[in-house]
Amino acid sequence: MLSRSIGKAAGGLVLGLSVAAAAHAAPLFEPVTVISRASANSEPALGKLLATPSTATVQEVRVDAAATAQPQLEFELLGKRVQAVRSKVEALPDGGSIWYGQFRSPSDRLTAATSSGQDDPGNSLILVRSGDTITGSIRKDGKLYRLRPLGNRHVLVEVDESRMPADHPADYNQLPKIPMADNDHIGIAQASSGTPATIRVLVVATNAAVTAYGGNMQSLVQLAVAESNQGYVNSNVGLTLQLAGYETTNYSESGNFTTDLSRFRGTSDGYMDSIHTSRNTTAADVGVLLINNSAYCGLASGIGSTASTAFAAVYWDCATGYYSFAHEIGHLQSARHDIATDSSTSPYAYGHGYRYEPATGTGWRTIMAYNCTRSCPRLNYWSNPNISYNGIPMGNASTADNQRVLVNTKATIAAFR
């Protein structure tokens, strides 16, 4: 049985580094000022950001996007100076790039990462560069921060995950359970990722979502895809999510997740019919609609999917960092929430997310799990009993093995187009 340990007990080879011990970290951004609600009254975009319940603190920062060409970065997280080491970098078709990295302790922050380096999802960052802008998710000691453009500036947002919207509408439990052809031949005690697969996703953002975000929406979408792929790598899923296309729509949102998702999915109802032409042209297996509805984080068309139902809607502010983008695609692959939240055993008794809630200390949860009783960070991992975080298995074979579900169904979805 393959067993991997991550976090403080981890030892993983970090790729893409050739950093001398004497190297200097490049400053990614410098603080300008913490923005108060009173000072944001004259700027609607800032006012909306500060009014978002999950926004704890907003700080204007001065960004040097060119710093992401370097293997080490340093910056200040609301008064605390930190340094990060690059694990890999990816080039984007539009000329941009994605920088993946890990935070290091002060004792090794200026040394090259080796096989003894830590690989901790609670101390990691992913940054998308587009021209002079940076859009990224930063987790330090489990706490989520977002770096993003807003108008002609950049802001660092400290996020209070306990105040994020509910994951789904109340009628989530009435979603159809859609049988899928699967490949459930990996044993319960095994951790095989099976044959690699690629799922292509078409992302459509409403104009309302683009306006409300006020940043570079395409970069946010690229960040969502990058985070999803990192989660698949972290959990040994053997799956790559590929951005087939991104476009916007002038569709006027109804204010109801179920209605908007139905209209997105419909091929001849007169609302967003053209996206199905785009789907075919781009050979997208899955479609995701980004909307400006803060009532919930997202909604999938079912637990499991067919080629005609592989659609989901996501509130833009939950898509990254909180991993709702990957979460909803997980539902389309038949993944369910943690067993305490969702006791259904269909289609897989083991197909649930996982929460770790110790009597004392900090807990955590995987991508498909609802929040802990005392609130806990959502880590970019799928439940998997064969992977441990700080010595704690991230699932169990009987009720919490989302990795196995994704491996079962990935080939089916990858063949939708």
From Swiss-Prot:
Binding site for Zn(2+): H327, H331, H337
Active site: E328
GO biological process: proteolysis
Enzyme class, broadest EC rank: hydrolase
Record-level Gene Ontology MF annotations: metal ion binding; metallopeptidase activity
Superkingdom of the source species: Bacteria
Cited Gene3D superfamilies: Collagenase (Catalytic Domain) (3.40.390.10)
Entry-linked InterPro entries: MetalloPept_cat_dom_sf
Similarity field: Belongs to the peptidase M72 family.
UniProt protein name: Peptidyl-Asp metalloendopeptidase
Species for this entry: Stenotrophomonas maltophilia (strain K279a)
